[in-house]
């Protein structure tokens, strides 16, 4: 079975991203998966300047596009691979992590971690309760709301896809045409509560709307640094919100000490 790990690392270089992507590349080699790290923008998704609620700076500072939608370019590789794992550039993988592709059995379309399943601080739990209501309460998708955890949205920093099941939902479209579907325009343009949204909201909406067979993966595959209370047990550590990390994520010696 042909397997690919796909990452996107465009824009300014960072010690954090260098460290994390190095760990992912080494992991791919260890489990026998191919590895691609996209370092130049390919899709260059830009909101409609006549309708967008996003600031001009949000895309012009990156050269006139939104880099948050670049990783969907991984969908173009289903012609060669049976399984694809898409991993954000701010995720560090331990050298003891098992093979993630074994976690997504053949019957599933898509796998990711429901963020609320992670053991977390009370402060972060309150934050995602508010976030999930803001992002998802107005969307007409069939899922259950929990008073303690909100909507069960998945953190899309880590996704695993089975070609045989997942690819059909793309309807033969290129990654660019997929992202530019009319149904996603409200997310791309950042309308209403989605002004600062990333591909995470779009993808959560889409996989639920399509009623995909979703594997809710164990939290250890995508544990959020500073939010997870058992971070040292995680296989994959997600250093999200880089600018709020010690020294904006550049003090990797401290980060390594915190998680190892």
What are these regions (language model features)?
Residues 1-59, 66-70, 79-80, 194, ...:
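N-terminal anchoring/stem segment of glycosyltransferases
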Residues 8, 38-40, 113, 217-220:
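Conserved beta-strand termini and adjacent loop/short-helix elements that scaffold enzyme active sites
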Residues 18, 119-125, 246-250:
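Short, charged, surface-exposed secondary-structure boundary motifs
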Residues 25, 102, 204-208:
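Non-transmembrane alpha-helical segments in soluble domains
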Residues 46-52, 93, 145-155, 163-260:
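A glycosyltransferase accessory/donor-loop signature
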Residues 48-87, 93-102, 110-113, 154, ...:
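A conserved donor-nucleotide-binding helix/loop in the catalytic core
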Residues 93-135:
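Conserved donor-nucleotide/metal-binding helix-loop-beta segment in metal-dependent transferases, i.e.
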Residues 132-150:
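Short, flexible, basic/aromatic active-site loop/helix in glycosyltransferases
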């Amino acid at each position: 079975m042909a397997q690919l790990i796909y990452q996107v690392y465009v824009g300014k270089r960072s010690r954090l991203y260098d460290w994390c992507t190095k760990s992912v590349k080494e992991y791919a080699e260890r489990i026998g998966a191919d590895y691609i790290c996209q370092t130049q923008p390919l899709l260059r998704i830009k909101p409609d300047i006549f309708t967008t609620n996003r600031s001009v700076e949000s895309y012009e500072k990156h050269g006139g596009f939104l880099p948050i939608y670049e990783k969907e370019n991984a969908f173009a590789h289903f012609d060669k691979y049976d399984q694809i794992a898409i991993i954000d550039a701010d995720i560090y993988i331990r050298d003891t992590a098992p093979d993630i592709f074994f976690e997504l059995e053949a019957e599933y379309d898509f796998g990711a971690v429901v963020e609320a399943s992670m053991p977390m601080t009370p402060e972060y739990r309150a934050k995602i309760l508010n976030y999930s209501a803001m992002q998802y309460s107005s969307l007409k998708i069939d899922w259950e709301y929990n008073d303690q955890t909100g909507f069960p949205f998945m953190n899309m920093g880590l996704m695993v896809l089975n070609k045989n099941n997942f690819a059909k939902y793309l309807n033969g479209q290129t990654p660019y045409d997929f992202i530019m579907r009319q149904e996603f325009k409200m997310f791309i343009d950042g309308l209403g509560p989605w002004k600062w949204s990333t591909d995470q909201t779009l993808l959560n909406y889409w996989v639920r709307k399509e009623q995909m067979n979703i594997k809710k993966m164990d939290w250890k595959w995508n544990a959020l640094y500073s939010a997870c209370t058992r971070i040292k047990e995680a296989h994959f550590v997600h250093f999200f919100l880089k600018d709020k990390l010690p020294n904006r994520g550049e003090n990797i010696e401290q980060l390594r000490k915190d998680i190892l």
